[in-house]
From Swiss-Prot:
GO biological process entries: actin filament organization; COPI coating of Golgi vesicle; endoplasmic reticulum to Golgi vesicle-mediated transport; Golgi to plasma membrane protein transport; mitotic cell cycle; retrograde vesicle-mediated transport, Golgi to endoplasmic reticulum
PANTHER family per the UniProt record, alphabetical: ADP-RIBOSYLATION FACTOR GTPASE-ACTIVATING PROTEIN 1
InterPro entries for this protein: ARFGAP/RecO, ArfGAP_dom, ArfGAP_dom_sf
Function comment: GTPase-activating protein (GAP) for ARF1 and ARF2. Involved in intracellular vesicular transport. Required for transport from the trans-Golgi network. Implicated in the regulation of retrograde transport from the Golgi to the ER and in actin cytoskeletal organization. May be involved in the maintenance of mitochondrial morphology, possibly through organizing the actin cytoskeleton in Saccharomyces.
UniProt keywords, alphabetically: Cytoplasm, Golgi apparatus, GTPase activation, Metal-binding, Mitochondrion, Phosphoprotein, Protein transport, Transport, Zinc, Zinc-finger
Miscellaneous remark of the record: Present with 9560 molecules/cell in log phase SD medium.
Protein name according to UniProt: ADP-ribosylation factor GTPase-activating protein GCS1
Species for this entry: Saccharomyces cerevisiae (strain ATCC 204508 / S288c)
All residue ranges annotated as the Arf-GAP domain in the record: 11-127
Length: 352
């Protein structure tokens, strides 16, 4: 990739031209120290006016930065042969109002003739001005309002207004605009608040509910709370779904070894013994309890058998050790006590 950079000699010559006479101010708005140029007209313009020229189209005008862009030799020659003062005199001699919008001022037969004149001057040719019988420069003022409405807002604010007057009017205009925008924002947020008050409270905002602040979540509906407690063993769940409640109780017992029989007896069996004896429970409830008891007895028998085998192996290993006699005897007593306690639990279930 080639190393592109601005020719320092070209930039120096352009900066020197910019400091001569009328070139010190923008051709269109009069802003001081213009840093852009339109080579087709050989004039110096400011940054904002350069943006307007860019929107006119390259067939009318194109712009270059006198410090950041590279100029072709013929473009640099047009800047040297032209200038803001010759262009101003040409417009005035042909009754072109300098305060007209750029679209009107540079897109007409008089402006085209000046570009042709500048080209002939650079090429050492004789310029012959053409006659435009159907063109009336005085009618450009009547069409300027229509052209201004199609021009960007920056152009409208700059047309025919001295720079000093615009700067002095800026604080008041900005203050009025800020007050109007503030009132508009307050009305908008007040309308949002009214709409939020009409939203339901039991739904999240994503589903059309009310916004209640950052981090807030609506309370769970009653059916969700009841669904969360349906997995626990309680009197209400047992009455509503006896078979499902006992099945869930059996699953909890099978998955957690630390869940003792006393917990199941206290939470499920004892509260319903009286209802069982009085015949208030249905036949489905009795069948569910019988199935639960049978599964519990089978699993508990298997567990007791496995535990007995474990204790036998533990006893055989303990007899081979002569250094832990007293400790082993104490462990035997704890195991026997646990066996008796498990047998008592099994007897309770058989009685039930």
């Amino acid at each position: 990739m080639s190393d592109w950079k601005v020719d320092p000699d070209t930039r120096r010559r352009l900066l020197q031209l910019q400091k001569i006479g009328a070139n010190k101010k923008c051709m269109d708005c009069g802003a001081p120290n213009p840093q852009w140029a339109t080579p087709k007209f050989g004039a110096f313009i400011c940054l904002e006016c350069a943006g307007i020229h860019r929107g006119l189209g390259v067939h009318i005008s194109f712009v270059r930065s006198i410090t950041m862009d590279q100029f072709k030799p013929e473009e640099l020659l047009r800047m040297e042969k032209g200038g803001n003062e010759p262009l101003t005199e040409w417009f005035k001699s042909h009754n072109i109002d300098l305060s007209l919008p750029q679209k009107v001022k540079y897109d007409n037969p008089v402006a085209e003739d000046y570009k042709e004149k500048l080209t002939c001057l650079c090429e050492d040719r004789v310029f012959e001005e053409r006659e435009h019988l159907d063109f009336d420069a005085s009618k450009l003022s009547a069409t300027s309002q229509t052209a201004a409405s199609a021009t960007p807002g920056v152009a409208q604010s700059r047309e025919g207004t001295p720079l000093e007057n615009r700067r002095s009017a800026t604080p008041a205009n900005s203050s009025n605009g800020a007050n109007f925008q503030k009132e508009k924002n307050e009305a908008y947020f007040a309308e949002l608040g009214k709409k939020n008050q009409s939203r339901p409270d039991h739904l999240p905002p994503s589903q059309g509910g009310k916004y209640q602040g950052f981090g807030s979540t609506p309370a769970k509906p009653p059916q969700e709370r009841s669904a969360g407690s349906s997995n626990t063993l309680s009197l209400e769940n047992f009455q509503a779904d006896p078979l499902g409640t006992l099945s869930r109780g059996w699953g909890l017992f099978s998955s957690a070894v630390t869940k003792s029989f006393e917990d199941v007896n206290e939470t499920v069996i004892k509260p319903h013994v009286q209802q069982w004896q009085s015949g208030e429970l249905s036949e489905e409830t009795k069948r569910a309890a019988a199935q639960f008891g049978q599964k519990f007895q089978e699993t508990s028998s298997y567990g007791f058998q496995a535990f007995s085998n474990f204790t036998k192996n533990f006893n055989g290993n303990a007899e081979d050790s002569s250094t832990a006699g007293n400790t082993t005897h104490t462990e035997y007593q704890k195991i026997d006590n646990n066996d008796k306690k498990n047998e008592q639990d099994e007897d309770k279930w058989d009685d039930f």
